C-alpha cells in the first residue's frame, strides 16, 4: 500500500476523531444521500437489501458518509470512511463514483485508496 493512501487513511482517522470530539450536530444530515424510497441515487438495481446501511454507521461512533458533499457530489479524501467494522461487502457502486471492491470480515483493518480523478474507493 502506498504512503499516500496511508496518509489519507490517517487523516481520515484524525478527522473522524475530531468530529466526535466536537460533536458535529449536522453529521446525521450528511447521511441523507438516499431519497425516501431507500434507493441510492445511482444506477444500482441490485443494491444492498438492507437500506439501513448508511444509518448503521452512525452508531459505530464515526459517520461513514461524512465525506460526501451532497450538493456537489464530490468526495474529500481527508474524511472518507466506508463501512468501518460492518463487513457488509458491497460489490456494486452505492454512491456516485464509489465502489467497494471486496467484502471484509467484521473488525478487520483496512486502508482506503482514493483517486481524485476517477473516484474509485477501494478496500485494499
From Swiss-Prot:
Residues 1-16 have a biased composition (Polar residues). It comes from the Eukaryota. One of its GO terms (biological process) is apoptotic process. The gene is TP53AIP1. Residues 1-46 are annotated as: Disordered. Only found to be expressed in thymus. It is found in: Mitochondrion. InterPro entries: TP53AIP1 (IPR029284). GO terms for cellular component: mitochondrial matrix; mitochondrion. It holds the Pfam family TPIP1. Induction: By p53/TP53. This is p53-regulated apoptosis-inducing protein 1. It comes from Homo sapiens. The keyword Mitochondrion applies. May play an important role in mediating p53/TP53-dependent apoptosis. Keywords: Apoptosis, Mitochondrion.
Amino acid at each position: 500500500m502506498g504512503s499516500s493512501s496511508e496518509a489519507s487513511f490517517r487523516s481520515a482517522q484524525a478527522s473522524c476523531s475530531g468530529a466526535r470530539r466536537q460533536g458535529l450536530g449536522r453529521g446525521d444530515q450528511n447521511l441523507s444521500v438516499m431519497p425516501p424510497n431507500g434507493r441510492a441515487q445511482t444506477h444500482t438495481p441490485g443494491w444492498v437489501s438492507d437500506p439501513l446501511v448508511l444509518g448503521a454507521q452512525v452508531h459505530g461512533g464515526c459517520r461513514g458518509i461524512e465525506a460526501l458533499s451532497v450538493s456537489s457530489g464530490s468526495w474529500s479524501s481527508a474524511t472518507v470512511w466506508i463501512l468501518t467494522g460492518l463487513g457488509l461487502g458491497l460489490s456494486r457502486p452505492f454512491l456516485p463514483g464509489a465502489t467497494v471492491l471486496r467484502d471484509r470480515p467484521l473488525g478487520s483493518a483496512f486502508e482506503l485508496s482514493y483517486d481524485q480523478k476517477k473516484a474509485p474507493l477501494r478496500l485494499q
